[in-house]
């Protein structure tokens, strides 16, 4: 367990650093110190994403709005985002651990949890731009694709800088993941 307290100002600074300068952030990121801090980060990112999704549902601007349950759907989206962020933190860390071991990087679970939590800064951004699907499905898909590719760029920097993975292997893995995301998007648009 970590004896330190959570500093919200440091959280905001680190969130900005991850988005603006991921290479620098991940090269100086702490990979130890307990799981409490990354868990708090994940919950905050999930709560912000949930609040935005809730707002879009209240204003009828989200991809899924109204219907039989009305505003209750928005509350469930909020709660679901928070629970999803906690579950996603640990599942994402396990997936990242496997990717890191393939790329000859760190196999320390805590370090992988910390990188995963840092990459979850994308959640509120994705939720914010989720309203684009309300106006135009294709625009929303393209924006979602761009956000996903940027998230993979963050993941690449986390692998190479914080987890000390092999750069070339990490590039190949990220290219494969980008190709999978693009294919899934193309097939999902094609089914409309």
Question: Can you annotate each of these PLM segments?
Answer:
Residues 1-49:
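N-terminal juxtamembrane cytosolic/stromal segments of multi-pass membrane proteins
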Residues 36-45, 72, 76, 80-84, ...:
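Alpha-helical transmembrane segments of integral membrane proteins
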Residues 17, 46, 50, 74-77, ...:
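Generic alpha-helix structural propensity
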Residues 93-180:
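Hydrophobic alpha-helical transmembrane segments and adjacent short intramembrane/lumenal linkers
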Residues 28-32, 66-71, 164:
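Helix-boundary and loop/linker segments of multi-pass membrane transporters
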Residues 52-85, 126-148, 184-192:
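Membrane-helix interface segments in multi-pass membrane proteins
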Residues 42-50, 54, 81-90, 116-120, ...:
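Alpha-helical transmembrane spans of integral membrane proteins, capturing the lipid-embedded, hydrophobic core
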Residues 2-9, 13-16, 30, 61, ...:
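Selective transmembrane helix interface/packing segments
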